[in-house]
């Protein structure tokens, strides 16, 4: 009997120890789980704090981006940002010394975020996407973005209709703009100095100096184009096609830089109601009475005005000095 009681007591003691071990293991697991949760929570908090410290914002205006360009980041604007101030993304003094080492970051700009003049002046390397719903690109907003030599890209959403004056103006040519298919207007110097994708046929208006020096060979202007401003585009040779929709062209609308190319000038669609061109690429009014563009042919010593031309616009006649012979009734217009 005593031996039986002894075994019962031992069994109870072993069961108690096992229960204590299980409880202890559960406590350890709970403690470990709590530590992991706290660690993750602290990490998330750190990221959140870091993100918050990337921007200086005053009354809804992003005054300064402080995240730097040493890492490739996806910059997410806080929802409270309604405007971007001048030079908000400009490089620091130290970053200007190490331009070649900076990383490309990306950022999306909402349709309701207003861009101030020079908002991206002197910025680091960026890929900027303008989100759908935006109607225009504001004046000077991306002007001189590559001031310090950083290369950037801007992707335009399909809703944009107008590139305003000097919006993408650039002296260094370190920026490329991807144009959308519904674009209608590029105003004065809107893309001057920037590289850009093919011109969409939707464009109706090209202001003076709007395209600047061609970053690649352009042989055709947009199909729906109606107006071309002065010095709209500068080419280095080759003819350019003008559609039947063009109604108004400034004298010197297209400029051909000094070139050894024998091929230059306009090729106007025969159905155009306002202009025509000849086999040399010279540009006339539809009735042939006005000469807007001409250059000295390789076979001639001077520019000879064809018979029937009554007005010659001197600013559009490319020659050396004044050595051209006007037609019998032509009048030289110095404008």
Model-derived features with residue positions:
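Periodic small-residue-enriched repeat registers in elongated scaffold domains
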Residues: 88, 119-120, 141-145, 167, ...
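N-terminal, intrinsically disordered, polar/charged segments of Gram-positive cell-envelope systems
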Residues: 22-50
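Positively charged n-region of N-terminal signal peptides that target proteins for export
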Residues: 1-4
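Bacterial signal peptide processing site
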Residues: 18-20
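C-terminal motif of bacterial Sec signal peptides marking the signal peptidase cleavage site
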Residues: 14-16
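Structural signature of tandem-repeat unit edges
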Residues: 50-58, 68-83, 94-114, 124-136, ...
């Amino acid at each position: 009997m005593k031996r039986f009681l002894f075994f019962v007591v031992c069994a109870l003691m072993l069961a108690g120890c096992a229960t204590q071990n299980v409880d202890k293991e559960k406590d350890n697991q709970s403690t470990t789980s709590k530590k992991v949760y706290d660690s993750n929570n602290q990490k998330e908090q750190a990221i959140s704090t870091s993100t918050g410290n990337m921007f200086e914002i005053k009354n809804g205006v992003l005054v300064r981006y402080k995240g730097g360009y040493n890492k490739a980041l996806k910059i997410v604007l806080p929802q409270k940002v309604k405007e971007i101030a001048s030079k908000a993304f400009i490089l620091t003094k130290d970053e200007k010394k190490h331009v070649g080492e900076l990383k490309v970051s990306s950022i999306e700009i909402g349709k309701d975020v207003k861009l101030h003049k020079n908002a991206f002046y002197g910025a680091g390397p960026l890929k900027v996407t303008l989100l759908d719903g935006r109607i225009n690109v504001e004046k000077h907003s991306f002007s001189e973005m590559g001031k310090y030599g950083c290369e950037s890209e801007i992707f335009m959403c399909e809703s944009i209709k107008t590139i305003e004056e000097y919006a993408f103006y650039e002296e260094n040519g370190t920026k490329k703009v991807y144009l959308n298919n519904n674009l209608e207007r590029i105003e004065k110097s809107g893309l001057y100095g920037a590289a850009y994708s093919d011109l969409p046929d939707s464009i109706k208006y090209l202001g003076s100096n709007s395209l600047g020096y061609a970053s690649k060979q352009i042989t055709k202007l947009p199909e729906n184009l109606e107006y071309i401003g002065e010095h709209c585009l500068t080419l280095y040779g080759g003819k350019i096609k003008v559609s039947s929709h063009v109604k108004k062209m400034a004298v010197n609308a297209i400029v051909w830089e000094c070139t050894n190319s024998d091929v230059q000038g306009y090729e106007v669609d025969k159905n155009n109601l306002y202009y025509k061109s000849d086999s040399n690429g010279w540009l006339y009014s539809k009735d042939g009475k006005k000469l807007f563009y001409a250059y000295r042919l390789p076979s001639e010593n001077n520019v000879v005005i064809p018979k029937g031309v009554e007005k010659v616009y001197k600013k559009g006649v490319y020659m050396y000095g004044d050595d051209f012979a006007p037609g019998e009734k032509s009048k030289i217009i110095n404008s």
